[in-house]
């Protein structure tokens, strides 16, 4: 059986899905994180391990194409290095793309559209007339508003604000501090500065649950971040010269685990766009391999 492999490598985990040529899923597996800017060696090893598990079961010779979507590969020569290492390990044709570009292909193929992504990080990828461009996606130091990491950091900024002013902790602060196992200066700093972004972003569900249960501070954070994501989408719309109807896709755990943030995002778009439709389905970026194979 001939098949294709798509890999969506993220800051928290990497997802591999193999498809037969009709688009049916024939193998799935989750592996370790894949961000070369964080750790190139671990990223390559995680990807090779995932592919090896798949080819061991389905046969290496039957695989026609592997597409890998990964954050930061447009920086330096990461894409070239990953392609070299993975092709060297398996002898299979490899396409390495920025994760947002690959996800956009999975949603729209070659059609025009804007994909807003909010997971550990955040970005927009917009394509029009066959040309794509990233908007946002500058990372946690320069941006990432609306991301799981940024949302959690906003909550921790409130915590340290309260500590410095001898203010009582609110309910959200208490839940977050209980989760990290401490409330002292050293314990908070150890958690924030001693963990990768993915570990910090993993606390996002606490804030999402708080908002769903009526916690006003949690809701305020998510409302603000939903508006930030909408502003990024509107920036992408204007930058690419859209003037009429547009299709917008939303992807990532932040959108799909917070009804409040998602609704705020849609409400903001409705204020500024005359006509748009939303693809709310959380489509796996791995499906882009089907589109890429069809172009060969």
Mark where each language-model region is.
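Phosphate-binding/catalytic loop of phosphoryl-transfer enzymes
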Residues: 73-169
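Short hydrophobic interaction/assembly module
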Residues: 56-60, 66-76
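Solvent-exposed, flexible loop/coil residues
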Residues: 40, 67, 77, 139, ...
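Glycine-rich beta-strand-to-loop/alpha-helix junction loops that act as flexible
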Residues: 67-72, 118-120, 246-255
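Broad gene-expression machinery/nucleic-acid interaction feature
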Residues: 13, 65, 121
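Structural motif
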Residues: 69, 95-97, 279-281
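ATP-binding/phosphotransfer module of carbohydrate and carboxylate kinases, centering on a glycine-rich
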Residues: 1-62, 85, 90, 107-114, ...
């Amino acid at each position: 059986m001939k098949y294709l492999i798509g890999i969506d490598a993220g800051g928290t985990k990497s997802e591999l899905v193999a498809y037969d040529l009709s688009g049916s899923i024939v193998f799935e597996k989750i592996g370790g994180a894949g961000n070369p800017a964080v750790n190139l060696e671990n990223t390559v090893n995680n990807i090779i391990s995932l592919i090896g598990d798949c080819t061991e079961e389905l046969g290496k010779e039957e695989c026609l194409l592997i597409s890998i979507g990964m954050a930061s590969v447009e920086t330096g020569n990461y894409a070239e290095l990953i392609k070299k290492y993975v092709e060297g390990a398996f002898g299979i044709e490899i396409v390495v793309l920025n994760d947002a570009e690959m996800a956009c292909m999975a949603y729209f193929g070659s059609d025009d559209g804007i994909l807003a992504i909010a997971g550990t990080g955040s970005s927009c990828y917009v394509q029009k007339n066959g040309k794509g461009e990233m908007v946002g996606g500058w990372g946690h130091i320069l941006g990432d508003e609306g991301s799981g990491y940024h949302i959690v950091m906003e909550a921790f900024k409130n915590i340290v604000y309260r500590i410095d002013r001898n203010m009582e902790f609110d309910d959200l602060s208490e839940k977050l501090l209980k989760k990290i196992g401490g409330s002292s200066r050293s314990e908070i700093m150890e958690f924030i500065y001693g963990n990768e972004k993915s570990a910090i972003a993993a606390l996002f569900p606490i804030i999402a649950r708080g908002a769903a249960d009526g916690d006003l501070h949690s809701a305020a954070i998510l409302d603000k971040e939903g508006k930030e994501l909408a502003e990024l989408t509107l920036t992408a719309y204007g930058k690419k010269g859209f003037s009429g109807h547009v299709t917008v896709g939303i992807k990532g755990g932040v959108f799909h685990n917070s009804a409040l943030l998602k609704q705020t995002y849609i409400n903001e778009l409705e204020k500024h766009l005359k006509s748009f439709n939303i693809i709310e389905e959380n489509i796996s970026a791995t499906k882009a391999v089907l589109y890429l194979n069809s172009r060969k």
